[in-house]
Amino acid sequence: MTRSGRPTRRAGLRTVVAALAAVPLIGTAGASAARQESRSRELLRPVPFPPLEVMTFNLRFASAEKPHSWAVRRPVMRTLLHRAAPHVIGTQEGRPQQLLDIGADLGPHYAWIGTSRGVGADEAVAVFYDTRRLAPAGYEHFWLSDTPRVRGSNTWGGGHPRMVTWVRFRDRLAAGRQFCVLNTHLDNASQYARERSAALIAARISRFDPALPLLLTGDFNTVAHENPVYDRLLAAGLVDTWDTARTRGDAYATYHGYKALTPNGGRIDWILATPGVRVQREWTDTFSENGQYPSDHLPVQASLTLG
């Protein structure tokens, strides 16, 4: 019989030692198999994707009007955007040169998609995106009117033509997962126009592939939870990411008009989403420099995963 284990002084223990030496061999084999099974399960488990940073931001159109001219506001906006580092920005009120300025300030890793709401060089609802993270797979513009394909159309009594720009993105860091972003700016003058606009947006949302996560960003010119416009969009199957966020920053009215901020004020700038989108955190960005805000609105940002 071949001896196993280390030598002992007591021959009577040799059998016991041999028996005990055999037990760990069985136990080790079992543990090894368990570890292998655990590793296999780990490999099969879905890899968590990094959060997507999404912002909605009414830029306040560029003008030379003092004291809040674009020349004064632009460097503050540049700093805010660099600090926030969003992957997607749904903007409102951007004018052509202003959008070019913001694109230059964001740097070479950002691009944008947008078009004038009117027939001339007018405001847009441009969507900026970080090209290191996202690639556009399709996009379209439509106008909030009875003739959505007609540029500048305004048939519901609104103060200005209103529109939606939507983009279908492919997430480079999420195995090419696709999702859609719709961005808009509803009318400030007419509740009727806002309600008709919400109904049209809801109808358009119903045409999208339900398997794709969807985000709706915008300045809706109505306070969340307090207007039929909000109710209509939630009835379309969307949720308010401010309400579903796991954690939230301090709440402020998102329009301030360059005056003192209003804690717990009305939110007219929202990020809505399909229910599968999980929001880790959402906040209103109150950044300013020497009392100067980059816009008369506060941007809202959400850190989320697409589910």
Residue ranges and their predicted role:
Residues 67-72, 93-96, 158, 188-196, ...:
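Soluble non-cytosolic domains of exported or imported proteins
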Residues 9, 40-43, 192, 206-214, ...:
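Metal-dependent phosphoester-hydrolase catalytic domains
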Residues 59-63, 94-98, 117-121, 133-134, ...:
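Solvent-exposed loop/turn segments at secondary-structure junctions
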Residues 56-74, 144-158, 187:
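Acidic/histidine-rich helix-loop elements
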Residues 40-46, 88, 92-178, 284:
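Structured beta-strand-rich core segments of catalytic domains in phosphoester-bond hydrolases
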Residues 2-19, 26-105, 117-122:
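N-terminal, active-site-proximal structural segment of metallo-dependent hydrolase catalytic domains
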Residues 135, 171-195, 207:
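Metal-dependent phosphoester/phosphodiester hydrolase catalytic core
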Residues 53-59, 77-102, 128, 167, ...:
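Active-site beta-strand/loop signature of hydrolases that rely on acidic residues for catalysis
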